[in-house]
Curated annotation (Swiss-Prot):
One cellular component term from this protein's GO annotations in UniProt: cytosol
Organism (species): Klebsiella pneumoniae (strain 342)
InterPro entries according to UniProt: Ribosome_recyc_fac, Ribosome_recyc_fac_dom, RRF_sf
Gene: frr
NCBIfam families: frr
Function: Responsible for the release of ribosomes from messenger RNA at the termination of protein biosynthesis. May increase the efficiency of translation by recycling ribosomes from one round of translation to another.
UniProt entry keywords in alphabetical sequence: Cytoplasm, Protein biosynthesis
Protein name, UniProt field: Ribosome-recycling factor
UniProt similarity note: Belongs to the RRF family.
């Protein structure tokens, strides 16, 4: 029983950390990354479609993304969707390819992005703590029903706390890496 609760909590905490890492990978740094355009949705014959389903995105150099649209008639719609996004990008067509140069980040924009990343980190920490609370509540319910002893309850809470500390440490490490990446010129 307790081991199931512990495993469930560990899996959920790991998912919180992975979701945070995935979320901050989409935040633009000075470096080109195909994941930057993951959130772009293009109107494809009246249907909102993710860019990844309509084109391949590759890194041409450290400051340029190259988009190869599978259906050439969709090039204009892809460009329009990129411009409409709040990423501040200005794509240009070159035949069947679309090039997206990434302008260097200003100091002010870097600080804004750092604040956003810190906010995401705090949300991830809160999510991890909520998982801890849920696990501890389940164990307390078992204690009330006299299915486990108080020693088991205490031991379980200590284990869950260690898992929580480890997950928060991972979030903090990812945050520090992203902040360092954002502040590089």
């Amino acid at each position: 029983m307790i081991s199931d609760i512990r495993k469930d909590a560990e899996i959920r905490m790991e998912k919180c950390v992975e979701a945070f890492k995935n979320q901050i990978s989409k935040i633009r740094t000075g470096r080109a990354s195909p994941s930057l355009l993951d959130g772009i949705v293009v109107e494809y014959y009246g249907t909102p479609t993710p860019l990844r389903q309509l084109a391949s995105v590759t890194v041409e150099d450290s400051r340029t993304l190259k988009i190869n649209v599978f259906d050439r008639s969709m090039s204009a719609a892809v460009e329009k969707a990129i411009m409409a996004s709040d990423l501040g990008l200005n794509p240009s067509s070159a035949g069947s390819d679309i090039r997206v140069p990434l302008p260097p980040l200003t100091e002010e924009r870097r600080k804004d992005l750092t604040k956003i990343v810190r906010g995401e980190a705090e949300q991830a920490r809160v999510a991890v703590r909520n998982v801890r609370r849920d696990a501890n509540d389940k164990v307390k319910a078992l204690l009330k029903e006299k299915e486990i002893s108080e020693d088991d309850d205490r031991r379980s809470q200590d284990d869950v706390q260690k898992m929580t500390d480890a997950a928060i440490k991972k979030v903090d490490a990812a945050l520090a890496d992203k902040e360092a990446e954002l502040m590089q010129f």
